[in-house]
Structures are given as structure tokens and as C-alpha cells.
């Protein structure tokens, strides 16, 4: 399970170093293989360990190619999907189209989301945090059926 936000750098060759604490689980459980694709709701990338991605692919396989919305979803997620492997230094290469989609430059954030990571431009991440906090403050959590009994 991946959790926490890590500030990392994108090097001039388009590579990022995965934080050390995540490397061993990625190597042992997923042979260092990761699939990167776009987030269809935010300007960030999603990084799935290979076995998690295979679950997503199984769901995508069941979607219709004749339904416009389903086909569009498949086209974006699969069209941008790129499999990478951790190198000996724990780095992965982010292909240019993916870097462009998420407006990634030098300073980026790798954010654990339990079964996957999000990869954000640092400034976009800070803005996203502000938006999330505003949403939570503006919503009546008790009226949200899935959050009504959620407590910390």
C-alpha cells in the first residue's frame, strides 16, 4: 500500500527516482514493472504497479467499443498507457506525451493512493490540496452516504 506525498525531481532525461521506501515492494511484488497513464479527471498521471494495472485492463476489456463514452475512456487510458521498469537506481522514464499531459517540469510530487501513485506538477498539487480542503469544508459530510459514518 502506497501512502504519503514525496517531493521529487524530474531529471533532464525525463526520469524520476521512486523513493526508496517504495522500491522493495515494487520489485518484490511487481518485478519493478509500472504502468503510467493519464488521470481522466485531473491534470496528473497515474502510476500503477503491473498487477494493479492488469485489474484495470480487465475492467476496460469489458467496456463497449460502440458506446462513445466507454470508447473514449478506453482510448485515453490505454492510448496513454506506457509500461516502464525500475532501473538499477530505482528510476523510471516518463515519456514526453505523459510529461506534457500533466505539465511536468523539474519539481513534481509523487502521491501514494493505496494501490497506485499520482504524479503531479508541484504547483498543481498545492492548488489541488487547496481545492480538496475547500470541498471538504463546503460539504456536509453527514449528508454524504459513504462518509456519514467515517471518523478519524
UniProtKB/Swiss-Prot annotation:
Annotated GO biological process: negative regulation of DNA-templated transcription initiation
Swiss-Prot/TrEMBL keywords: Cytoplasm, DNA-binding, Repeat, Transcription, Transcription regulation
Any GO CC annotation of this UniProt entry: nucleoid
One GO MF term attached to the UniProt entry: DNA-binding transcription factor activity
Subcellular location: Cytoplasm, Nucleoid
Keyword DNA-binding tagged: yes
Gene3D superfamilies: Transcriptional regulator MraZ domain (3.40.1550.20)
SpoVT-AbrB domain boundaries: 5-52, 81-124
Pfam families: MraZ (PF02381)
Family affiliation: Belongs to the MraZ family.
NCBIfam families associated with the record: division/cell wall cluster transcriptional repressor MraZ
HAMAP family: MraZ (MF_01008)
Record-linked PANTHER family: TRANSCRIPTIONAL REGULATOR MRAZ
Quaternary structure, from the entry: Forms oligomers.
This protein's name: Transcriptional regulator MraZ
Species per Swiss-Prot/TrEMBL record: Shewanella sp. (strain W3-18-1)
Gene, per the UniProt record: mraZ
